[in-house]
């Protein structure tokens, strides 16, 4: 089949850059949309919710079906049509008039509501597919304005698809939505800075008028206002748009951008006030609801039956940060310093690991000494400033709770680093980005649904084991989604708590555990809080440190060489078969952990145990135990009071 002559003539007039970009963008859009429309989302997500998905799912369907923001019995019953497990992790708040509302920003499910009305739950994915296609179009268009088309194509693909972005494309969560909104907003602001010179006739077209004229600044301000409402930590991203015109003495332009941004943010919070009676969508009396209860709360959901109400079930939450936590000596001097390193190369959150194309963009920008503009320096400052603000404001949960893959709180900011990329005349930079980033994330993005529901699996092996574990977020690491691997009581009075962050430790047996044969196991230890009895008979919690650790090792049918390292130097122990040895290990100071002002400071430690040999009891003694065992370990801490 041949193309019509007129169509062929028009295509020949288009540049290679235009044809390559248009065809690739169309192909990506077709693939993503067909995937979004046909995937069985309930099955691939293991018929359950993770993170905050239950809240956004329920609110999205409420807006699509009932056209309201209120949580009612019909909203709860609707969940069971698809999810037999119910809305696990549903996050609700009581409004000023006593009605129940969703304690999350409404803008993401509101944007998804038309697609949910048309396509059901897959409407979330349809929205994501459209946004991902738009992001690629923006990324390619910006890069291609100064780079060879092939180079632009390769880097744009790496930036979007060979990072953790695809993991959040498959989740019912606002993180990818915020990323797309911010990236698109910066595109409207930045494109005019790199666009080639065009004729007045071309300037008159609607496409170039919006992109190259002052209206594009207002579009950018609107989009960044939406992003700031959805994630207030992104508020610093408006700064380059305000400072850049001020440096050029364009005062009127700066005022228009600032007013537009402010009006959007105020309007969105005003709508929240009109609906719920409170401006803060996470403020007031709020609770998280699960089908099963816990130590201090009952399971169930409001309206599930007559006995289950907002007051009778659910886990109460306290909103907002606290200066009692943020501005302590430990937080500013010890925790912040560690968080800077974790932020860049952390095992579960590192920017250089999960969002490497952003780091490559920074490197290319700093290396291109002749092509660095002031607006790009401002963009870099906004990105870095947002990271620092995040670490200072949320020192113990800056990657997002719920066991995320990578740093989901910073994902929205990641997009701005694209606009640091200088002109690329060859594809070397993009190919290098593909190779290095692929080493870290290909095992994740190859199956993003599995990575979303099993966020700790990739970090248990390979290069991730060589990266530092984020001790400052011990209770927010992905392994916390596995209750039998976290907060495990071992020896000591009171018992020390262990977190088994890989699969080289078998589940606890009493106060001991087996390390897998021929393996190195990593675990975290958290010192408990000791009640201290006052003269008046009132118990007050007291922080404890681990001064030393008594290690008791026991081998099985094979001799073994065991190596223990607590950060104070390795200790190597040669052991005969069926023998036992004990010794003391001096412990480092420990990392302070105080995520809430009502709780005393805990101290967290990292420990590795390596077993050089192993045996299978089934083949040694006829036991039914088929595990590959290395060495059995008991840990008994000696505590000292925190100074």
What do these predicted regions represent?
Residues 60, 155-160, 207-231, 238-245, ...:
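Membrane-interface alpha helices of multi-pass inner-membrane proteins
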Residues 65-108, 112-116, 287-334:
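Interfacial juxtamembrane loops and adjacent helix segments
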Residues 254-364, 380-393, 442-451:
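Membrane-lumen/periplasm interface segments of specific transmembrane helices
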């Amino acid at each position: 089949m041949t193309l019509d002559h007129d169509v062929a003539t028009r295509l020949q007039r288009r540049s290679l850059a235009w044809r390559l970009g248009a065809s690739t963008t169309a192909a990506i859009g077709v693939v993503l949309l067909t995937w979004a429309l046909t995937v069985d989302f309930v099955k691939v997500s293991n018929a359950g919710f993770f993170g905050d998905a239950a809240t956004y799912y329920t609110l999205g369907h409420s807006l699509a079906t009932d056209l309201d923001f209120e949580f009612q019995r019909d909203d709860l019953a609707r969940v069971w049509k698809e999810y037999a497990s119910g809305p696990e992790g549903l996050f609700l708040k009581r409004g000023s008039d006593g009605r129940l509302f969703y304690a999350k920003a409404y803008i993401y499910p509101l944007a998804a509501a038309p697609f949910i009305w048309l396509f059901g739950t897959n409407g979330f994915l349809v929205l994501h597919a459209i946004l991902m296609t738009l992001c690629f179009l923006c990324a390619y268009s910006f890069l291609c304005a100064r780079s060879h088309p092939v180079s632009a194509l390769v880097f744009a693909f790496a930036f979007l698809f060979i990072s953790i972005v695809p993991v959040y494309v498959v989740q019912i969560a606002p993180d990818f939505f915020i990323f797309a909104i911010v990236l698109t907003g910066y595109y409207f602001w930045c494109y005019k800075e790199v666009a080639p010179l065009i004729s007045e006739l071309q300037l008159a077209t609607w496409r170039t008028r919006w992109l190259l004229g002052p209206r594009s600044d207002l579009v950018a301000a609107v989009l960044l206002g939406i992003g700031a409402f959805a994630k207030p930590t992104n508020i610093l991203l408006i700064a380059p748009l305000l400072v850049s015109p001020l440096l050029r003495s364009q005062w009127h332009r700066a005022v228009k951008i600032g007013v537009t941004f402010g009006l959007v943010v105020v309007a969105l919070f005003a709508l929240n006030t009109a609906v719920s009676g409170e401006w803060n969508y996470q403020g007031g009396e709020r609770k998280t609801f699960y089908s099963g209860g816990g130590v201090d709360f009952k399971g169930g959901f409001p309206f599930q039956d007559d006995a289950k109400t907002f007051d009778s079930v659910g886990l109460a939450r306290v909103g907002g940060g606290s200066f009692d936590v943020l501005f302590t000596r430990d937080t500013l001097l010890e925790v912040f310093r560690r968080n800077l390193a974790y932020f860049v190369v952390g095992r579960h959150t590192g920017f250089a690991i999960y969002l490497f194309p952003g780091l490559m963009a920074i490197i290319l920008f700093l290396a291109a000494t002749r092509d660095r503009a002031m607006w790009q320096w401002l963009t870099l400052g906004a990105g870095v400033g947002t990271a620092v603000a995040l670490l200072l404001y949320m020192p113990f949960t800056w990657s997002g709770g719920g066991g995320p893959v990578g740093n989901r709180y910073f994902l929205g900011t990641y997009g701005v680093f694209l606009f640091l990329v200088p002109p690329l005349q060859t594809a070397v930079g993009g190919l290098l980005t593909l190779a290095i980033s692929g080493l870290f994330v290909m095992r994740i993005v190859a199956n993003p649904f599995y990575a979303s529901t099993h966020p700790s699996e990739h970090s248990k092996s390979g290069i991730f084991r060589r990266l530092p574990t984020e001790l400052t977020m011990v209770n927010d690491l992905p392994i916390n989604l596995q209750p039998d691997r976290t907060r495990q009581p071992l020896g000591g009075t009171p018992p020390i708590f262990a977190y088994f962050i890989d699969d080289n430790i078998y589940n606890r047996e009493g106060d001991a555990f087996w390390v897998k044969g021929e393996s190195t196991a990593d675990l975290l230890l958290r010192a408990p809080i000791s009640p201290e009895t006052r003269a008046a008979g009132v118990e007050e919690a007291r922080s404890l440190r681990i001064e030393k650790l008594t290690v008791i090792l026991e081998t099985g049918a094979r001799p073994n060489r065991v190596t223990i390292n607590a950060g104070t130097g390795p200790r190597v122990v040669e052991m005969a078969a069926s023998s036992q040895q004990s010794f003391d290990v001096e412990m480092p100071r420990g990392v302070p952990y105080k995520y809430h002002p009502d709780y005393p400071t805990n101290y967290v430690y990292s420990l590795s145990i390596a077993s050089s040999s192993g045996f299978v009891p089934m083949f040694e003694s006829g036991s039914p135990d088929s595990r590959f065992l290395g060495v059995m370990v008991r840990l008994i801490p000696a505590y000292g009071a925190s100074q």
